[in-house]
Structures are given as structure tokens and as C-alpha cells.
């Protein structure tokens, strides 16, 4: 049999490629990487220094040639410079007996304002002199007779940051002066004496004389936009950075390895645990509590569009948020669609889902086979992630994007290590830099960048032998600096430096060694130290401690990848250290650890499994520590911020169900420790079983044997059930959950639709049955109750500084709780029953009698039984289901009662029943006592008041006005969406339809209303916004008088929801000033003057 010969083998000689030839093949990429990378970095670094177009604004007065007051509240409080010229003859309008009521020729603040002399400039008549007062300093004074004489020409005044000076031109100092015969002038220096400007006000009228001039240069250094040169440089810088990264990618491909898929296999599949996490996050998006700063951030975002830059609206004299404002700019764009809470927080929900996707698809598989295959690790990771995210990240603060940024930075570093390529390192630098500048707490992301140094050095060392160092480093340098372009796109280097120096000087600016304050707050029984927040942090610390201990003891956690797990641990430790350098110390900053908490939870779950920790004793001790963490966490309140707290069980007390939960958990801790001791002394085996369990039982046992997973999911269940129960128990009254669910149906105005406002309390007064209106209040019995039995000052008791709350304080360390108009006082004319007490809420003294039990000197027992007042019909009661009595004093609820009767019972002098009032408000100030009409039988036709004051302490007294049934309208109907409103920063998210007053070109819009949170919230946030901090309160208190309007929360009548104040200008006829605008080009180093610091 013939065989076929095999074909001869032909050896093919392939061309060899040397390192030098390979470098030549990538020469273009190398050149592009070097040139584009270096130029991109240079342009990014130069961006803050490049010129901008600044809009200038000049406030000139008189306007329209007349003596007419104008409003121009400067957001920076002071002008960069101020020049005033007043002809001497202009003072003639202040002279003579016919002008006794006219005292101010010109001022920068209304003379009626409480702090007018302390803060502003007033050119006024004092007795027979004309005095120029600047910030409580009489700068120059001249007799009015000399001012109106022939020698006096004009008064000039100039103000700059370093000095202020004034002179009466033509007048000289008198013979008794220090320098007789010298020009009559005054000067102050060594301090910033520039006066605060909220407008130009005068008591004079008519045409303005020639030569009268007021010219203030408004500080508009932040009202700027990029010049064409800067815009071109920024565009070119981004393009060159992109080109450098493309070149770096080409150099990366020189290793000959095929491209690895970017997304993990089956990344789109959803399992049972994924479904549970998604369901919890979505439900929490609707019913969950928000963070305290959501209103702060939302208002900044809403106002920024009209303002032209992202100013810190509530503090620091309107300086910009940059370099931390880019995330808020995205929220400002998002707010164009809707300002409803569920819409504004939609990006936060997307970040939460992305965080879990990254943890479950990227982090857990990279931590090693033991973590990847452990169900306990997955459940613990999910529980830890949710335990941190739910209480800390369900709002508009930047912590969610920082938590996500830290995870993405770590993933990019790990991809760089796995592929030995540099492009992921460059991407990590971009993500890390954006995370770093998302907010002050972005400093926690520095750990994710630091852990990239080691892998970067290794890869650079390997690649530099082929391509050199510069082609590899230049693109990374460009990537690390490109974030300067969006940060400084419309601002200058000098402006940002001055803004940050101002914030540090004004404060709060706590030092690194003040970090203990954050943990003090964590262990306070307040929303800052609530059960949920305390457990989140303690569980994170426990997971970190276990992971570190096992890594140190065994070199690595058995079954885990050493490099990635060490880097996760390192990032967390560095992040905790970096948090020490944040200028404020609040517990919501811990939200940046949400992603790391899930990752560490997975590591800790593996670290305490039987495979890694074989000792049953040690595993039991760990379980005892977890139970102790639960006990320590439940030694607090289940409290949340502001409206999120409505209806929440145990919101003001430690949880208790038949017995104290914290005590029960502590006892359980002792029992588990006794079990650990038994394992140590008696059953000291490792506890491993030889029988092979079923797959289901193995999974169940793995989860049950992970106490951290059980604890975290119990807390998650507790939080979700608490807030869901709050929504159910509050219904039909307002709650966060109800409001968010209704927003799906188009009802997006939040609390404004449920707050009922009583504009005219006089209209709802009940009519006396028999006695005259003036006498009815004391017609039954009046012993020691008199029309003037009320102290002149009934200001609410101040609240002392609470431990740990040292970030914001006023000058005396006290925060008073009185609402404007409720602090009492006296009137010149007596009221209907002879009382001179000043009444709150626009009550008319001519129609409202008042009786009180207080007297000067020794107190005596007092009793009051009013006459009968006619109740409305049952149909009318349904339309206004509340009875109100305005009262003042300090008394127990049982000491003031409401009695009802039928006509027959009243005629016989008997009552058919009685009830106590709900006392909502701050004692001893005026407040509205409430009683639901539903508690009064439908057969009752008359009511009367009964008060009994047997306490003889001087501070214990009662003052009452007649009962009334309020006629109310919703706050949305009263305030509307058009009026400018001063929204306190706690309420911004709850009132999304109200328009916050804006600012533009350095001048604030004048608000007509102010909405405050509940008393405790108002006391906490008002110091943030005051004059010392450069906030809007320092403007409104000079420009307007605030009056509290009576208001109630629908179907939740006894709730202190907050307050509505009407803001009335001291000069009602003053119009907004017209500014003279212009545009100039400024360099990045230009500064007009120092920023005002107080």
C-alpha cells in the first residue's frame, strides 16, 4: 500500500521587532501624549488666572432727581468704596420746628432698625447738631446753624476698606477743639469701618438740590463670565486632555494584550438580593427622611440661575461655593424641570443604585473567591450599605456622589493593577479630583487617590523602559488637573482665595484636633446622634476593626485577595483621618462611607466565618460585640430632621416596648459573652461539622452565622418600618411619605398646601352671649385678673448652648426663641378693656380684651371664669375645625380649660364638660392654645374659659384673650409662587413652590415673607444666617419689621410645624434702586478690596 509523502515543512521567518523599533511605531502617540498632556495641564492650571468679564454695578442717588428712599440691600453688606457729597443747604429740611419729625437727611439703613446706628451710616440731626455717624462712631459733628450758614459749602465722605473720612468743607474746628482753626473733618482707620448698605433712606421730600451725590461701588467680583480668551483656553484644555488620554491608551495597547471587557459578565442580571436592595431604596426615596441641609442646597441651586453664580445663599456674605460648587450646578440644571423633592432627589436614588451595582458587580468579585462565593458576605455588604445610606444619604448633600466617587476611583485603580495599564489610573485621577471637589467632605476621597501611588509606580517603572517617563506621566498630569477648568470656569483665582479666607475667618472653621466634636454629637440623644446614625458609624468601625485585626494576624483574611482588600482597608482608614480636616464636624459627613461600608461589610463577614476564624469562642465574642453595638445605638432617640420627624415612633425618647430595648440588648450581650466563656472553658472545639448540609441549609447557615448581617438588616427594617408607620399614623395629616406619594399625582407644593394661615384673627372672634365685648372675658368671675396683668416683656426663654453645638453662636452664647411680635410690649393707647399690652398676630386691641394674673411685687392667687361665648353652627364648625385662645405666661395645661354647655345649661350656670388646651409655643411669649372642635359635643352651643393661678412664683402667671375660631387659607394661597420669600434653610425642600428671594449684581431682592421651621429648628439655624456670619438675617432685620402670622397644620393641630412671618419695610414707599451696570475685563489676580468680615 502506497503512502502519500507528507509535504515538506517550510519555516517562515518573521521579522523581529526590537524595543527601539516598537518605540518608533508609537512615536506619534508618544509625542501627542507629551505635548497634549503638558499643554492640557498648563491650560488647566492657567484657567484660574485667565481674565474674566466682570459686570460692574454702581448705586447712585438721588434717583429721578428727588429725595426718595430706595432699597438696595448689598449681599456683601458693604460697598468696595463709597463717596458722598451733601450740599450744606440740603440740611435746611431738618431745621425749624415744622420739621421736628424729620431727623435723617441720608442713611444707608432705616433709622427705625434696632441695629441701625451700630451697622450703618446716618447723617442726622441730633438736638441742634448735624452728625455723621458711621457704625456707632460720630465721625464729624457741626452745629446746624453753622451748616446752614454762608461759609459751609458741602459735606464730603469717603469710605474704603482701610479708612473712612468726612469733612465739612468751609467749616473749621472751634476754639476748644484739639486743633482750633483746622478744617472740620474726622477720620477713622485701623479697622474696616465701611457702613452696611441696604439702601439709601431719607426723611426729606421734594426735588434734590444740585451737588447732592451718593455713589457706592457694589462688590460684584463674583458676577463674572469667561472672556473669549478664557473660553478658548478651557475648550482647548479639555480637548488636549482628551487627546492625551487617547494617546495614553494607544501606548497602553503596546503590551499586545487584547482588550478586556469593561463591564463584568452578566452585569445586567438581577437576583433576589438585588431586588430587595432596589425595593428598599425606592421605597425609602418616597417615605425616607431627608438630611438637614437639603433646603440649604436646593435654595442655592434655585437662586443661582438668576444670580449668575453659585453663591452661599445663607452665609459668608454671598461668596461662591467654588471650588465645591460643580455638583450644585448640576442640581441647578435639574431644578429647571421641577423643584419637588422626589424629582430633586432622583439623582441621589440613581447614585444609590449605582453604588450597590458597583459593590455587588465590581467590588465583591475583586475581593477574592471567599467573598465572591459567600452569601453572608453579600447580605452583610447590602445591609451595611443600606444602614449607612438610608439615614445619611437620602438628600441633596454631596455625600452620595462622594461615596460613589470613592468606589469608582478604587475600581479604576484596581483595573489599572489588573491590566497593568495607565489609562485607568488617569481616569481614577479625574474621578478622584471631581469627588474631592464635590464638597468639603470630598477630602475623604483622598485615600482612593493615595492608594493609587503604589500601582502607579510599578506600572510606570515597567513601561518607562520602553516609552520613557514623560509620555506616560503627562496625560496623567493633565487628567489630574483638568477639573480646575469646570471649577474656575467663571471665577478667578484671587476671588476664590479671598472667599475661602473669609469663610475660615468667619467660621465655622474647626481644627483637626476638634474632631472629637463629631463623635460627641454622635453620642447625643438628637437627630445627629440618632439610633440609625449611631449604628451606621459604629458598625462601620466594627467592620474596619475586624478586617484590620484579621489582616494583621494572618497577613490577609483567608480566601480574600490581599491587594484589593488591603487597599479598601487603607482607603477607609485614610478617609477617617482626612475627615479630621473638614471645617465643620457634623455626623451627616459619615455618609461618604456608604460605599466603603458595604465593601468592608463583605470583608468582615468573611473574616468571622468558620473558615477564617475557627474558634467558636472568638466568633461568639464578635457576636456579643455586635449586640453591644446595637445596645449602644438604641440608647438614643429615633429622631430625624424637621418634617421627617413628624409621627415617627420614639422620635423624642429611647425605644421601649414593654421594656427598654437598650437594656434588653445589653442583657443579651452579657448572655452571649457567657456563652463565649462556656466555649472557652468547656466546649473549646472549633465546632466544625462533618456532615454535608444541603445547599439551602448551607446558605441559610452562612447568613445566620453572620451576626453583623443580621444586625444591619434589623436596623434597616427598623428604619423603614418607623418611617412607614409615621406616614400611616399621620394620615390624613401631612408627612414626608404622603407628600412624596402625592407628588406623583401632580401635588408638588409640599407643606404649603397643608399649612393653614389665619391672616385676620379678629374676624374669627366668638361673640359674647350676654355681656358686652369689653367685659365678657371676666364676666363670670375675675379675681386678681386685670387688663394690665402682663409684664412688659414676655420674650421667650433663651436656649443655652447645647454640648457639642459650638459651630454657630451669637455674641452672648444664647439663642432666643421668640417669634417677632409675640414678645409683648406696651402701646400708647389703651385697648377695649383698658389694657396697654401689645397683642400678637395682628389682633386689634380695640376689639380684643385681655386679662392677666401677673402683678408687680407680691403675687396673689388669681381665678378667672369668662362669660359664655356663642359657638357657630355644626355646619360652620366643619369648615373651621379648631378653637383657639391667644395666651401668654407660664402655666400648666390643666390651669386653663375650656368648658362647654347647651343654652339651658349655660342659663343655669352649669357646664356640660371641659377640656384642656394644647399649648404649642414658647413660654412665656404669646402663643395660640388649640382645642379641636371635634372634641366638643355637637349639642353644645356655648363655651367659656376657666383659669386658675394658685402658684405665687413671680414667673408663673396667665394672660388670656377671648376664644375664636380661625378663618384660614392655605399658605400656598396666601404666599403663592410669585412673592419673594425668605425660606430658612431647614424648610427649603418642604416648600418647593415658594420662590426664594434672589440676588443679582451684588444686590438682594427684598423678600415679603419669611418661613421658619419649628422652634428648635429656628433656634438652631438662625445663628447660621445672622449678621455675624454674613447671612440674610443681617439684612432683613435692618430693612424690615417681621410680624408672625398665626398658622396651623391641617389635621395635625397640635404640631409646631414652624412659623410664617410677614416682612414689612420700615420705609414702605422705598422702591428698588436702579443700578448703573457696566462690563470690564479683570485678570485672575485682581481684587477690588478685602471682603467684609463682620
From Swiss-Prot:
Localisation per UniProt entry: Cell membrane
Low complexity composition-biased segments: 817-831
Superkingdom to which the source organism belongs: Bacteria
GO biological processes: Actinobacterium-type cell wall biogenesis; cell wall organization
Gene Ontology molecular function, alphabetical: arabinosyltransferase activity
Keywords: Cell membrane, Cell wall biogenesis/degradation, Glycosyltransferase, Membrane, Transferase, Transmembrane, Transmembrane helix
Keyword Cytoplasm appears in the UniProt entry: no
UniProt xrefs under Gene3D superfamilies: 3.40.190.160, arabinofuranosyltransferase like domain, EmbC, C-terminal domain, subdomain 2
The keyword Transferase is assigned to this record: yes
GO CC terms of this entry: plasma membrane
TM ranges: 28-50, 232-251, 264-286, 341-360, 373-392, 431-453, 466-488, 530-552, 565-582, 586-608, 620-642, 657-679, 700-722
Annotated region described as Disordered, given as residue ranges: 817-836
Membrane topology of this protein: Multi-pass membrane protein
Chief site of localization: membrane
Its EC number(s): 2.4.2.-
Similarity comment text for this entry: Belongs to the emb family.
Function in brief: Arabinosyl transferase responsible for the polymerization of arabinose into the arabinan of arabinogalactan.
Record-given protein name: Probable arabinosyltransferase C
Gene name linked to the record: embC
